[in-house]
Amino acid sequence: MMLALRCGPRLLGLLSGPRSAHLRLPAVRACSSGSGSHGSSSSSGNPLVYLDVGADGQPLGRVVLELKADVVPKTAENFRALCTGEKGFGYKGSTFHRVIPSFMCQAGDFTNHNGTGGKSIYGSRFPDENFKLKHEGPGVLSMANAGPNTNGSQFFICTIKTDWLDGKHVVFGHVKEGMDVVKKIESFGSKSGKTSKKIVITDCGQLS
């Protein structure tokens, strides 16, 4: 699969990767960093989960995510259960296999670790739940896919506003704490998506 990476009208390069469920993206229209914030507290009652992340065996820190179960309950439950590992499989020990600075950090392939695998708690794939939530800024948590209704376990965290993905990828949460850790992950990425260090989810689970 070949994916074009654009900043405005200028073609910066082509991204190549294994043929499968890489984050399927149209041309990137902008490379500006947003300043959006989701706040530090919530009274929604939505689940809070965490990802502890390391790079080449060195801890980077913890990312805490709020899952929008009030808007996309099925998608949120899939991610929550993959964080806890309660179904017998999940994100612990898997990698951020594709990281593009000023764009996004992609992870969730816990079977092949390269963007070609992963599975949901509902089976191999499940449908797009809805597109009510938008890719409004840094810290947005969204599902990677290989086209409509092909959600599995792969996800990405945006590091800029990516509104051209609205209606194509299901947003289901956002970073509550640890955006500095996301930026550290981003620093090991490249325009091709290949990371300079092995970035691993060393632990994960549910906080509330």
UniProtKB/Swiss-Prot annotation:
Residues 1-30 form a transit peptide. It is found in: Mitochondrion matrix. One of its GO terms (molecular function) is cyclosporin A binding. It catalyses: [protein]-peptidylproline (omega=180) = [protein]-peptidylproline (omega=0). Keywords: Acetylation, Apoptosis, Isomerase, Mitochondrion, Necrosis, Rotamase, S-nitrosylation, Transit peptide. Its main location: mitochondrion. The keyword Transmembrane helix does not apply. Gene3D superfamilies: Cyclophilin-like. GO terms for biological process: apoptotic process; cellular response to arsenic-containing substance; cellular response to calcium ion; cellular response to hydrogen peroxide; mitochondrial outer membrane permeabilization involved in programmed cell death; negative regulation of apoptotic process; negative regulation of ATP-dependent activity; negative regulation of intrinsic apoptotic signaling pathway. The modification N6-acetyllysine is found at K68, K168. Signal peptide: none annotated. The modification S-nitrosocysteine is found at C204. Its EC number is 5.2.1.8. Belongs to the cyclophilin-type PPIase family. PPIase that catalyzes the cis-trans isomerization of proline imidic peptide bonds in oligopeptides and may therefore assist protein folding. Involved in regulation of the mitochondrial permeability transition pore (mPTP). It is proposed that its association with the mPTP is masking a binding site for inhibiting inorganic phosphate (Pi) and promotes the open probability of the mPTP leading to apoptosis or necrosis; the requirement of the PPIase activity for this function is debated. In cooperation with mitochondrial p53/TP53 is involved in activating oxidative stress-induced necrosis. This is Peptidyl-prolyl cis-trans isomerase F, mitochondrial.
